[in-house]
């Protein structure tokens, strides 16, 4: 059993503001849909390997909700909750849900000529729980004689572009972004007892639409 704590240095009478007032109520929602990937999020998918899985032909759809936790000149931090529907009936594993709670760090790229936002990129880290173990994880782990777990580490990579650069600023899509999200579940190389000592996981490549509200 372990216990811990944190302490943030600051002025009690003048608390540090982590969000600028004009963005204090900022929230967002996202929908995404995609396919089971063959490669791993690190060193394969992030290097351009977008092949479909050779282990199982499945799809995933999801919706997520985010709250801005901290904004900055270069990076914003958001807290996110996501619900995914796994479509694995054709592979004999049925259809089921998984859930993720995580934090994302989001950066932005700007045009050198106009200082307008051109794209966003983000990395998310948290935990995932699935109602069933995805079929790809079952098959990969069985081939190695390893454990499976419904509760695993969650990683996410996202790259998208502001739709206001395509549509008029008066459009309902002016606060929306379209792009690609990579969804990943894994056991952190079999180094975690709480995750069942699972080594390996599963990845999905999805297209998404994300829109801000309240800013």
Descriptions of predicted regions:
Residues 1, 25, 55-61, 93-101, ...:
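Residues that define the transmembrane beta-barrel architecture of outer-membrane proteins
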Residues 46-52, 86-93, 141-146, 192-196:
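Extracellular loop and loop/strand-boundary signature of outer-membrane beta-barrel proteins
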Residues 12-27, 68-77, 109-120, 164-178, ...:
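Short loop/turn motifs that connect adjacent beta-strands in outer-membrane beta-barrel proteins
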Residues 7-9, 33-39, 67, 81-89, ...:
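Transmembrane beta-strands of outer-membrane beta-barrel pores
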Residues 1-67, 210:
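Short glycine/proline- and aromatic-enriched beta-strand/turn motifs that initiate or cap beta-hairpins
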Residues 3, 27-31, 75-81, 99-101, ...:
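Transmembrane beta-strands of outer-membrane beta-barrel proteins
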Residues 1-4, 8-17, 154-215:
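Predominantly the C-terminal beta-signal and adjacent terminal strand-loop region
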Residues 59-131:
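Gram-negative (and chloroplast) outer-membrane scaffold detector with strong preference
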